[in-house]
C-alpha cells in the first residue's frame, strides 16, 4: 500500500493543489470524510467547509463550497465550485458577507430566498473558520 496519495484541488478558474499528501479531510455533503492512502474508491458531492490535508507533517487548509469529490486508492480529486487557501481569504470581506447574509435571513422584507441566505451564511462561516486555521 502506498504511503501517500496525490491530492488535486481545482475550481473552474484554477488549480489550487496538486501534490503528494499523507492524509485528507474533506467536507462531503453528508459530513466530513477522512482519506488515507489505500482508501476504497468513491464518488461524492462536496459540501461547504474546510478541506484539510497533511504534507510532511504540516496541515494546510482550503475553504471549499460545493462541487464533486473522487477518491481512488492513491488519488483524491476535488472539483470545487469555489475554493480558497486559508492565507488567501480576506477576513474583513468574509465578516461583511456573514453579517449581510444573517441580516437577509432575519429580514424577509429584503426579498432574499431563505435557503439562499442560509447557504451564504454557511459559506461565510466556512471561509472564516478556514482563515482562522492559517
Curated annotation (Swiss-Prot):
It comes from the Bacteria. GO terms for molecular function: ATP binding; proton-transporting ATP synthase activity, rotational mechanism. GO terms for cellular component: plasma membrane; proton-transporting ATP synthase complex. It is found in: Cell inner membrane. CDD domains: F1-ATPase_delta. Keywords: ATP synthesis, Cell inner membrane, Cell membrane, CF(1), Hydrogen ion transport, Ion transport, Membrane, Transport. It is a peripheral membrane protein. Signal peptide: none annotated. Produces ATP from ADP in the presence of a proton gradient across the membrane. F-type ATPases have 2 components, CF(1) - the catalytic core - and CF(0) - the membrane proton channel. CF(1) has five subunits: alpha(3), beta(3), gamma(1), delta(1), epsilon(1). CF(0) has three main subunits: a, b and c. Belongs to the ATPase epsilon chain family. HAMAP family: ATP_synth_epsil_bac. This is ATP synthase epsilon chain.
Amino acid at each position: 500500500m502506498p504511503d501517500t496519495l496525490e491530492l488535486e484541488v481545482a475550481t473552474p478558474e484554477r488549480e489550487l493543489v496538486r501534490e503528494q499528501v499523507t492524509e485528507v479531510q474533506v467536507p462531503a455533503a453528508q459530513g466530513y470524510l477522512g482519506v488515507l492512502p489505500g482508501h476504497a474508491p468513491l464518488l461524492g458531492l462536496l459540501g461547504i467547509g474546510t478541506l484539510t490535508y497533511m504534507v510532511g507533517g504540516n496541515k494546510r487548509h482550503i475553504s471549499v463550497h460545493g462541487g464533486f469529490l473522487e477518491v481512488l486508492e492513491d488519488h483524491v480529486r476535488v472539483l470545487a465550485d469555489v475554493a480558497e487557501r486559508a492565507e488567501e481569504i480576506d477576513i474583513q470581506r468574509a465578516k461583511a458577507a456573514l453579517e449581510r447574509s444573517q441580516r437577509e435571513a432575519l429580514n424577509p422584507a429584503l426579498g432574499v430566498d431563505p435557503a439562499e441566505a442560509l447557504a451564504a451564511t454557511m459559506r461565510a462561516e466556512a471561509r472564516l473558520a478556514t482563515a482562522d486555521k492559517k
